[in-house]
Amino acid sequence: MAQSVAATTNTSSAKPRLAVVYFSKSGNTESVAKAVQAMTGADIFEVKTVKPYPEAYKPTTEVVKEELEKNIIREVQPIDIDLSKYDVVVLATPSWWHHTAMPLQTWAKAQNFSGKLVLTCNSHGGGGLMHTREDFEKILKPTGARLGTHLTVEGSVRTNSKEVRNWRIANGVLAK
């Protein structure tokens, strides 16, 4: 069960330094990431694959299903980010076949989140939370990350910005 965890920084009066890292295919997850950035002033980073997914929806779902079933690692492009500069890291993913998208999993598994407050969120087209939080817990707990609560958003956040704002506040990540 997720619990609210207030963000802490190296100095008690300083605002937490935030980074948002996301993977998005259709743009829904990108809208969540950009909403968090707009509300907090966070630095934002996009995970991109070396080999793109098919443009059309159905072929993409078939490729993604095979990747998940066979644990196929899709190579991701390097991101110029130094996580040691951040107190809070927001990870945003689409829910693909009820799981965290493999490109974000690939990127996150290669990072050191020790001592960081990590907030996780997923967008979906009707499937809900499913296993995305469990996926994040499996990836992040061994790194020493402190997990905040998880946010699940259906579609984009154009109509859910209040939900994103409440999630940030519940985790001690206030507006800029």
Roles of regions detected by a PLM:
Residues S84, K109-G115, G127, K141-P142:
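Short, conserved loop/helix-junction motifs that constitute active-site signature segments
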